[in-house]
Amino acid sequence: MSLINKEILPFTAQAYDPKKDEFKEVTQEDFKGSWNVVCFYPADFSFVCPTELEDLQNQYAKLQELGVNVYSVSTDTHFVHKAWHDHSDAISKLEYSMIGDPSQTITRNFDVLDEETGLAQRGTFIIDPDGVVQAAEINADGIGRDASTLVNKIKAAQYVRQHPGEVCPAKWEEGSESLQPGLDLVGKI
């Protein structure tokens, strides 16, 4: 079932905040009022996952400039996130919150739970300031994501929100032309 244009469901979870080196509670209410990226991944202390999370960290400054909060989520606990952060070269670089979802509530809410393994699939969601999902990407377990494309998707989502009636075509980049759907464009693209 698609979550696009749907408000995220309620949840309460514990997260590890590497910036403050502390645990904190996170709820769906924390997503209101700003743009958010939620990056689900299968497991801590694994293989593709640290490469993805490090890549996301490499884009973190750009995401912060766009006013985007970043959260990673797995079905591990927040304690395991802290241990991973303390022992992995890649994960020790992270500045964004790592949400633990051992109850699988959030993973189920976003429909990325692999029922056979009990782990999260590789899902990335862009959530607007109203708590509504604007973009989703889910990859098979062996396929890592590229965070640089995520930055451009967020820019497009923000542009469309700020410019009602306009849409961003394929390969749209900030500063390039958008489209205004209407009868005058039918069959001309």
Swiss-Prot record:
Which EC class, in a word?
A: oxidoreductase
| Reaction equations catalysed | a hydroperoxide + NADH + H(+) = an alcohol + NAD(+) + H2O
Which keywords fit this entry according to its UniProt record? Antioxidant, Cytoplasm, Disulfide bond, Oxidoreductase, Peroxidase, Redox-active center
- What molecular function terms (GO) are annotated for this protein? NADH-dependent peroxiredoxin activity; thioredoxin peroxidase activity
A cellular component term from Gene Ontology for this protein is: cytosol
Keyword GTP-binding (UniProt): no
Q: Where is the Thioredoxin domain?
A: 2-159
Localization: Cytoplasm
* Job description of the protein: Thiol-specific peroxidase that catalyzes the reduction of hydrogen peroxide and organic hydroperoxides to water and alcohols, respectively. Plays a role in cell protection against oxidative stress by detoxifying peroxides.
> How does this polypeptide assemble, per the annotation?
Homodimer; disulfide-linked, upon oxidation. 5 homodimers assemble to form a ring-like decamer.
Remarks, miscellaneous:
The active site is a conserved redox-active cysteine residue, the peroxidatic cysteine (C(P)), which makes the nucleophilic attack on the peroxide substrate. The peroxide oxidizes the C(P)-SH to cysteine sulfenic acid (C(P)-SOH), which then reacts with another cysteine residue, the resolving cysteine (C(R)), to form a disulfide bridge. The disulfide is subsequently reduced by an appropriate electron donor to complete the catalytic cycle. In this typical 2-Cys peroxiredoxin, C(R) is provided by the other dimeric subunit to form an intersubunit disulfide.
The name of this protein is Alkyl hydroperoxide reductase C
Q: Tell me the classification of the organism that encodes this protein.
A: Bacteria, Bacillati, Bacillota, Bacilli, Bacillales
Q: Which gene encodes it?
A: ahpC
